[in-house]
Amino acid sequence: MSERLTDNPSLFRLRVRYGKRDRLKYLGHLEVIHTIERIVRRAGLPYAVTQGFSPHMRVGFSSALPVGTSSTCEWYDLFMTEFVALDEAFGRLAAASPADLAPIEAAYIDVRTPALTAQLTRLSYRIDLHLDPEAPVSADEVHRAIDTLRAGHGIDYARGKKSKRLDLDHTLVGYE
């Protein structure tokens, strides 16, 4: 099936970076997918559909973001059947998007480019600490706490009935 899509000379691939902020950070990944599909339909872009028994919009997403996490660097690839000028496509997507899920940038890429999930192999998080002004904590204390966590090489935690171990040797590669 992917060969049919990549061999099609009239197929265009628009890579869009978008943000997931404020109220919409509480949407799950499937809800984000459905919302983006509605945005594309409202924008009137000529999207491609998959082949097969149950055709659906040909769009690929980066890895799922944890529910409740804001981001300004989420991605999706939209396959289109007709070329639309980049400024026009971006403007139509922006006009059809809610502010908390708006596109930040877009670019056409080669249709044969590997999927986003194959390209994005690392995630980077920024944590903003909102500390109590009555009990100030210095940056050195925060760094020492992280170093203590790393010295144990992991954190055991329970999620539901399963207990897991988060490997911090690979998770906390660098921090400021």
Task: For every predicted segment, state its role.
Residues 1-8:
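Charged, low-complexity intrinsically disordered regulatory segments in eukaryotic signaling
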Residues 11-12, 17-19, 23, 27, ...:
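Extended, well-folded interaction surfaces typified by the phenylalanyl-tRNA synthetase beta subunit core
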Residues 25-30, 47-48, 83, 87-88, ...:
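Ordered, soluble secondary-structure elements with a strong preference for glycine-centered loop motifs
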Residues 48-81:
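Short, charge-patterned binding micro-sites
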Residues 86-176:
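Internal, well-folded beta-alpha domain core
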